[in-house]
Amino acid sequence: MDETKSTNLLTKRVIVGIDQTTVQHKGSLNQAEQDYIALEVPVALVYNGISHVVMMASPKNLELFAVGFSLSEGIIGSSNEIRSIEIVESCHGGTEVQIELSSRRFMQLKERRRSMAGRTGCGICGTEQLAEIFRPIAPLPFTQTFSLSLLDNALEQLKTVQEIGELTGCTHAAAWLSPEGQLQGGCEDVGRHVALDKLIGLKTQQKWTEGAILVSSRASYEMVQKSAMCGAEILFAVSAATSLAVEVANQYNLTLVGFCRRGRATVFTHPQRLTD
């Protein structure tokens, strides 16, 4: 490890990784080395004083997470329905994100409120009824196109928003691509759903409307649903897509592309938005 680096990985005054002494096994040799470990902390989203969900996440860009989660979960329809967001460190080693909703939205939330302890890879923990899993989303229009010839360069650009991942090998990334294939911005997190929610918050903040989403993970149905909820018509995933992701993408008119690697990709649904 470079001795000029801090003992903690510090990003914009937020500690997102720590030093850890490890034993590296290489061939027949065991050697003690310092390594970076990505921080994973409990983050509670609290709406109008009532805890709604606890997710395991990287302690960075939590305001964006609050906005993105609220939008992708249908808690709000517009960021204007959030009156304030405050980040409060908890005495239990976690973080509370205190979100003040408009009265109308909070009343609606109370009607459908669920208490759940989320995990890094879990998007439906604590959902009380199966009907709540599939949200009624209007089919997306066909207004966006994207050239697959731009994908290789986009994959290279994705590395620029994976600062924590480069040092720890432990995070997922989600990025917004312009129709010309330029990376407009991105977010990373130990949880793939959280990384996407943070991106949705960033997309809302920056008012991006045209383009596509690129994620470093697989495409589960939750990733498809969150993308559709924010109006994205195209979702590129570095890894595979699940059967339910393909089914939901078809239902929402979302173009789903998996196995995005240099020189190749697999188009699962609605290829008409893609050009060579």
Swiss-Prot record:
Q: Does the keyword Cytoplasm apply?
A: yes
InterPro entries in the record, alphabetically?
A: Cytidine_deaminase-like, FdhD
Q: Where in the cell is it found?
A: Cytoplasm
Q: Spell out the GO cellular component terms annotated for this protein, sorted alphabetically and separated by semicolons.
A: cytoplasm
Q: Which GO terms describe its biological process?
A: Mo-molybdopterin cofactor biosynthetic process
Cite the Gene3D superfamilies for this sequence. 3.10.20.10, Cytidine Deaminase, domain 2
**Active site, UniProt feature:** C122
**UniProt key word Calcium:** no
Highest rank taxon of the organism: Bacteria
Predominant location category: cytoplasm
Keyword annotations from UniProtKB, A to Z: Cytoplasm, Molybdenum cofactor biosynthesis
Q: Which GO terms describe its molecular function?
A: sulfur carrier activity; sulfurtransferase activity
Binding residues annotated for Mo-bis(molybdopterin guanine dinucleotide), in chain numbering: F259, C260, R261, R262, G263, R264
- What is the protein's known function? Required for formate dehydrogenase (FDH) activity. Acts as a sulfur carrier protein that transfers sulfur from IscS to the molybdenum cofactor prior to its insertion into FDH.
Please give the family membership noted in the entry. Answer: Belongs to the FdhD family.
PANTHER family linked: FORMATE DEHYDROGENASE, SULFUR CARRIER PROTEIN FDHD
Protein name as annotated: Sulfur carrier protein FdhD
Organism of origin = Proteus mirabilis (strain HI4320)
What taxonomic lineage is listed for the species of origin? Bacteria, Pseudomonadati, Pseudomonadota, Gammaproteobacteria, Enterobacterales
Q: Which gene holds the coding sequence for this protein?
A: fdhD
